[in-house]
A protein has these predicted regions:
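Short, well-ordered amphipathic alpha-helical segments that serve as non-catalytic structural scaffolds
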Residues: 27-43, 68-72, 97, 148-155, ...
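Conserved beta-ketoacyl condensing-enzyme motif
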Residues: 22-112, 118-135, 190-214, 286-287, ...
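N-terminal extracellular/periplasmic Venus flytrap/periplasmic-binding protein-like
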Residues: 10-13, 24, 28-33, 44, ...
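Active-site-proximal alpha-helical scaffold in enzymes
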Residues: 87-118, 156-186, 255-262, 327, ...
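Condensing-enzyme catalytic core mediating Claisen C-C bond formation in acyl metabolism
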Residues: 1-27, 224-290, 294, 301, ...
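Conserved catalytic cysteine-centered active-site region
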Residues: 25, 57-111, 131, 142-153, ...
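Acidic, glycine-rich active-site loops and adjacent beta-strand->loop/helix elements
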Residues: 10-13, 56-60, 89-93, 117-122, ...
């Protein structure tokens, strides 16, 4: 079995959907920027050596359909000999793509693969443009199609999570993200993207305005506990889940260069880190958000580690309710979780998120002298995923 490294991992800044800076940027074009951004970090690597591109996408249709990974590989200028595939495990798709690349290289099926994810919720909304539910499931197992927000309400009720706890968690997400941006902690991982959007000039005329998008749009320095408390529940009249304590609709892309350690050494390419374990698990879809509770122990067992050996954790904040429940049930030290903010502030571009969090974690771990880190998230349909990273 081959030793496998992650040689580079980058992401775009995350735009707010559907009215943010990336609202007119096609997802296949956006993914190409991420792919090229990752490859620019490993200049020793000739593009002819890239054997495959694997991109995760949660809603692979319309502008992110037609095998968006293949389209993005063409837009990135990769050789036609480099194949590509799009994979979908909803919110864990970006992490899944990296895990698949690692497994493929470990087994000798390739030496160099670009893996990542892309999602434009501006172009393709949650659920897609034309949802078509299975009639049998609608009749016999309607919980399998329960909206994500209602699953969060159920998790909150089941695990005794209060509205106050959820709003406080959301506030901290914004505070940490704002501080991280001010400190420049995301600058190295972000690939600047040139965007052109309509804007009104001083005379009231609408003209095309060009800019370089390189700072996450979501974090709000002006939010407060009082402001969050005023928001009404979105999914249930008597519920607790609001727009303020849920992840944002987002646009973004991320990519990683995954290589055999042997080939990287030959080219003089250092390792950013290694994905040493990846696990998934199913759970009741009506409590989808609790998925990491079942995936994390499996990943830890695979890695031969205990939870207290994990120094940093990127736990995707689909909803404050489910993130708090996962922390509570697993007994995670909250001080290790989302130290630079999470999806409530920074956004959640579905199929991109797992690769995005990997890029962030691989940079924060060396800063804090952490050897082992974890990326984990709940997954629509009742699942959880977890990956363990090692640096040094």
């Amino acid at each position: 079995m081959k030793d496998v490294i992650i040689a580079a991992a980058v992401r775009t800044a995350v735009g707010k959907a559907p009215r943010g800076a990336l609202r007119t940027m096609r997802p296949d074009d956006l993914a190409a920027f991420a792919i090229n951004g990752a490859l620019e970090r490993v200049t020793q690597l000739d593009r002819s050596e890239i054997e495959d591109v694997i991109l995760g996408c949660a809603m692979p249709e319309a502008e992110q359909g037609l095998n968006v990974a293949r389209v993005a590989s063409f837009r990135a200028g990769l050789p036609v000999e480099c194949s590509a595939m799009t994979i979908n495990r909803f919110c864990s798709s970006g992490l899944q793509s990296i895990a698949m690349a690692v497994d493929r290289i470990r087994g000798g099926g390739a030496d160099v693969i670009v893996a990542g994810g892309v999602e434009s919720m501006s172009f393709v909304p949650m659920g897609g443009n034309k949802p078509s539910l299975n009639p049998w499931l609608v009749e016999s197992y309607p919980g399998s199609y329960l909206s994500m927000g209602l699953t969060a309400e159920r998790v909150a009720k089941h695990y005794g999570i209060t509205r106050e706890q959820m709003d406080q968690f959301a506030l901290e997400s914004h505070r940490k993200a704002v501080a991280a941006i001010a400190a420049g902690r995301f600058e190295d991982e972000i690939v600047p993207v040139p965007v052109t959007n309509p804007a009104m000039d001083a005379k009231g005329k609408v003209k095309a305005a060009e800019s370089l998008f390189q700072v996450d749009e979501g974090p709000r320095a002006d939010t407060s506990l009082e402001a969050l408390a005023k928001l009404k529940p979105v999914f249930h009249a008597n519920g607790m889940v609001t727009a303020g304590n849920s992840s944002q609709m987002s646009d973004g892309a991320a990519a990683a260069v995954v290589m055999s350690a042997e080939r990287a050494a030959q080219l003089g390419i250092p390792a950013m880190g290694r994905l040493i374990a990846f696990a998934t698990a199913g759970c009741d879809p009506e409590e989808m958000g609790i998925g990491p509770v079942f995936a994390v122990p499996k990943a830890l067992k695979m890695a031969g580690l205990a939870l207290d050996q994990i120094g940093l954790i990127e736990l995707n904040e689909a909803f404050a309710a489910q993130a708090l429940a996962v922390i509570q049930v697993l007994g995670i030290d909250p001080g290790k979780v989302n130290v630079n903010g999470g999806a409530i502030a920074l956004g959640h571009p579905l199929g991109c998120t797992g690769a995005k969090l990997t890029a962030s974690l691989l940079r924060e771990m060396p800063r804090r002298g952490v050897k082992y880190g974890m990326v984990t998230m709940c997954v629509g349909g009742g699942m959880g995923a977890a990956g363990i990273l090692e640096v040094g």
